[in-house]
């Protein structure tokens, strides 16, 4: 799968760049108002009681700010954050080393927590519940169990697939919050904030145009801003105006709904080769040359969300809105 400009996941090089644009405190964080307001209450209450914050699970599509919120929680609590990911914790010893290095009150952030191996996850249960670590020393008949006390800490887990979490792990989180896609006006604010940090001149009309094509996702909005800046510096006078933004986005093959060439390829395959559907997932994967899992987990969610695609018991169907967006007539059935 090629790296897509409109992918919600971080692309190569962005992990080092994104921290410069991230807000540090809740009052700087744009959008997700309900989540933000609730977190503010929970954080203030924990500080008043001089306790650690309950464990927090953040879930939702990629690129919406889960990692940013984890860092904000640590900043608001006045503690350090240690960050890792589910796939990085391959053995129980990997997690044990992290847990024993924490200081009282620290935030441990585990991204992609649904990908924790089961053996590692089981070590996490007593750590979350009782702030202790059960380890086995020795092998065979001489093996014995030791219990190590851990400092109180807050686990912040992030996942794009909350349903993939086991019930025992999910039940140990005191705070569970879903992050939603952003509104266009919120994304425009995020773009204007990033532009100010990066010393980019952009007018409000251009910011709104980028926001409309950012698929409700701040990471994509910031990525489009940086790419359009290149066009402004080379093809213009450095300022991002509406005409320049439109031209740059068209050259980048990001249309007015935020669809790229792969989205178009998928919709056109359903319409032109299967008369609009229904078509099975495996068949569609073979036709466009992608894995079925990639289509289902990466390409389809946004098309479903904006009403261009439907999943039916018989397969995928292109909606009348998809025909209209592509400038095609809906066939009479």
Swiss-Prot record:
DNA binds at residues 311, 316. ATP binds at residues 21-22, 63, 66-68, 129-131, 172, 182, 219. Residues 183-253 are annotated as: Small ATPAse domain (RuvB-S). The keyword Nucleotide-binding applies. Transmembrane segments: none annotated. Its EC number is 3.6.4.-. Residues 1-182 are annotated as: Large ATPase domain (RuvB-L). Homohexamer. Forms an RuvA(8)-RuvB(12)-Holliday junction (HJ) complex. HJ DNA is sandwiched between 2 RuvA tetramers; dsDNA enters through RuvA and exits via RuvB. An RuvB hexamer assembles on each DNA strand where it exits the tetramer. Each RuvB hexamer is contacted by two RuvA subunits (via domain III) on 2 adjacent RuvB subunits; this complex drives branch migration. In the full resolvosome a probable DNA-RuvA(4)-RuvB(12)-RuvC(2) complex forms which resolves the HJ. The RuvA-RuvB-RuvC complex processes Holliday junction (HJ) DNA during genetic recombination and DNA repair, while the RuvA-RuvB complex plays an important role in the rescue of blocked DNA replication forks via replication fork reversal (RFR). RuvA specifically binds to HJ cruciform DNA, conferring on it an open structure. The RuvB hexamer acts as an ATP-dependent pump, pulling dsDNA into and through the RuvAB complex. RuvB forms 2 homohexamers on either side of HJ DNA bound by 1 or 2 RuvA tetramers; 4 subunits per hexamer contact DNA at a time. This is Holliday junction branch migration complex subunit RuvB. The lineage of its organism: Bacteria, Bacillati, Bacillota, Bacilli, Bacillales.
């Amino acid at each position: 799968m090629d790296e897509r400009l409109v992918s919600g996941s971080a692309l190569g090089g962005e992990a080092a760049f994104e921290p410069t644009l991230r807000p540090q405190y809740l009052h700087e964080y744009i959008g997700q108002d309900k989540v933000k307001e609730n977190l503010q209450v929970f954080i203030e209450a924990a500080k008043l009681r001089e306790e650690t914050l309950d464990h927090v699970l953040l879930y939702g599509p990629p690129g919406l700010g889960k990692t940013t919120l984890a860092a904000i929680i640590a900043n608001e609590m006045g503690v350090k954050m240690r960050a890792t990911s589910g796939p990085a914790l391959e053995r129980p010893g990997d997690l044990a080393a992290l847990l024993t290095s924490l200081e009282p009150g620290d935030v441990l952030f585990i991204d992609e927590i649904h990908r924790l191996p089961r053996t590692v996850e089981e070590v996490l249960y007593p750590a979350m519940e009782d702030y202790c670590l059960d380890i086995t020393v020795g092998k065979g008949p001489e093996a014995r169990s030791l219990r190590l006390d851990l400092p109180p800490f807050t686990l912040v887990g992030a996942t794009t697939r909350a349903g993939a979490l086991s019930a025992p792990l999910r039940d140990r989180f005191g705070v569970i919050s879903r992050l939603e896609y952003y509104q266009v006006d919120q994304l425009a604010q995020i773009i204007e904030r990033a532009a100010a940090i990066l010393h980019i001149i952009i007018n409000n009309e251009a910011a709104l145009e980028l926001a409309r094509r950012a698929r409700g996702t701040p990471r994509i909005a910031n990525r489009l801003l940086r790419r359009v800046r290149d066009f402004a510096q080379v093809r213009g006078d450095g300022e991002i105006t509406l005409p320049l933004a439109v031209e740059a986005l068209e050259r980048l093959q990001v249309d007015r709904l935020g669809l790229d060439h792969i989205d178009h390829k998928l919709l056109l395959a359903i319409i032109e080769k299967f008369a609009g559907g229904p078509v099975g997932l495996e068949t569609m994967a073979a036709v466009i040359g992608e894995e079925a899992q990639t289509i289902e987990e990466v390409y389809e969610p946004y098309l479903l969300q904006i009403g261009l695609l439907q999943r039916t018991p018989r397969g995928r169907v292109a909606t009348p809105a998809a025909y209209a967006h592509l400038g095609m007539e809906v066939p009479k059935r």
